[in-house]
C-alpha cells in the first residue's frame, strides 16, 4: 500500500475505500483476497504498532478502517474481522464519549482538526453494528446538538479552518470538512 519507508495506517485506510469501490463496480474477487490478507496483517501488527504509532491521523480516523473491516466481514463472515474491529475501535478516538459531552472537545475552541471531526461522525454508528448500544447510535445526533451552541454554523456544518473554532459568520469551514461529513452521513 505504501512505498519506501513511509509507514502510516491512515493512507492505507484511504486505499481500502478505493478497493471497496473498485470491487463494487467490478466484482473482482482479488479485492477480497487483498483486503483479507491486509486485515490479517493489521490484526498481527496493531497490538505493537497501534493506529497512532506513526501519526495521529489513524487514531482520529479509525472509523474509516472499521467501516472497511465490517464491510468485508459482511461478505466473508471471517470471525477474525470482528476481533480486528474490536481492536481498531479500542485504538480509535473515543467519539461516542466525546459526542455525549463526556470530554470537552466539543466545547473547546481549537480542540481538534475540523476534518477529523467530520471523519469521526461515522465511527459510533459503525461501531453500533457490533455494540448494539443505543448510545453509540445516537451519539452523532447529540454531537450536533452540542455543536449548535458552540462552533456550529447555520449551514449545519461547523466553523473550522484547520482547527475548530466558535461560530463566527465571517469564518467558514473547510471544503474537506464538507466532503468528509457527506461521506460520514
Regions found by a protein language model. Give the residues of each.
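Glycan-recognition and catalytic cores of secretory/periplasmic carbohydrate-active enzymes
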Residues: 1-185
